[in-house]
């Protein structure tokens, strides 16, 4: 299992460890990944992800998984998240069509 966020595709980053004497040595910054189950209200389905805590905070800020996926640019999402986003959009379009038909 690689240490990659399954929603945003974030990977480990690289940098320098700087000592008190300002000596620099190479190091890696690993993600703080957690296994979580997130629920989609629109699809009425649960999804399991390995997600970075930064992504979890963003999901909380946006409101829920659906709002996060719909408000995030597709380029920034992983393949798995892009598939879920496409399914969300299909369901939303279908609901709008049903509303338009029922109003007419």
UniProtKB/Swiss-Prot annotation:
InterPro entries for this protein: Ribosomal_bL28, Ribosomal_bL28/bL31-like_sf, Ribosomal_bL28_bact-type, Ribosomal_bL28_sf
Cellular component per GO, a single term: cytosolic large ribosomal subunit
Assigned keywords, A-Z: Ribonucleoprotein, Ribosomal protein
GO biological process: translation
Glycosyltransferase among keywords: no
Keyword Ribosomal protein: yes
GO molecular-function terms, A-Z: structural constituent of ribosome
HAMAP family referenced in this protein's UniProt entry, alphabetically: Ribosomal_bL28 (MF_00373)
NCBIfam families: L28
PANTHER family: 39S RIBOSOMAL PROTEIN L28, MITOCHONDRIAL (PTHR13528), LARGE RIBOSOMAL SUBUNIT PROTEIN BL28M (PTHR13528:SF2)
Family: Belongs to the bacterial ribosomal protein bL28 family.
Name of the protein in question: Large ribosomal subunit protein bL28
Organism: Wolbachia pipientis wMel
């Amino acid at each position: 299992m690689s240490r990659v966020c399954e929603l945003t595709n974030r990977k480990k980053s690289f940098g320098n460890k700087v000592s008190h004497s300002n000596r620099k040595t190479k190091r890696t910054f690993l993600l703080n990944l957690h296994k979580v189950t997130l629920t989609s209200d629109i699809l009425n389905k649960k999804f399991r992800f390995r997600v970075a805590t930064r992504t979890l905070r963003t999901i909380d800020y946006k409101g829920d998984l659906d709002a996060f996926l719909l408000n995030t640019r597709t380029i920034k999402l992983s393949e798995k998240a892009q598939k879920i986003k496409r399914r969300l959009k299909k369901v939303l379009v279908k609901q709008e069509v049903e509303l338009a038909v029922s109003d007419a």
